[in-house]
Amino acid sequence: MQQENMTRGHAWQFLEAGRRLERAINGLSLIAGSARRCRTDDAILTPLLEVTDSTMTYRRLHFARPSLLPVADLLLLSEENPRSTSAQFHRLARVFAELPAGTSGNPGHQRELLDGLRSELASLNLDALRSFPDAASHRIATLCSDLATGCESISAALTEHFFSHAHRRSD
């Protein structure tokens, strides 16, 4: 209901930021677990696509059974998939541009954190991993875990900057 009935002010921006962070964290956790499991059983990728609401998109792009690298490309890097991590980060950047200056701390800190995560995600070279399936699953799982931790740091930075009324003392 709030998506249709809420005015698009600052409260909306915070709600949208929370939604994007939550979707990114949950998706990254699912992808990380699936990548680890995929070393022994790639059947886990079909339910992963279902849970991330990306089955039809995958089928439209790939006329084959799901495999790790194309699934990772769709769920992590694809700008066209609105459920991908890259799309969540893109929408977060737009939200951050609309947020007020705040009352304390570094107003650009969450943007800097997000820029770092976007760079880290962009560094994933799936083509280089095609010949090394074990390394691919490890690299994807590790990257997803790191990105999820980074998203939690962004959430903490937003909370501290906009919702913390206590000031840190500099010693």
Regions found by a protein language model. Name each.
Residues 1-171:
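Alpha-helical transmembrane segments and their helix-helix packing motifs
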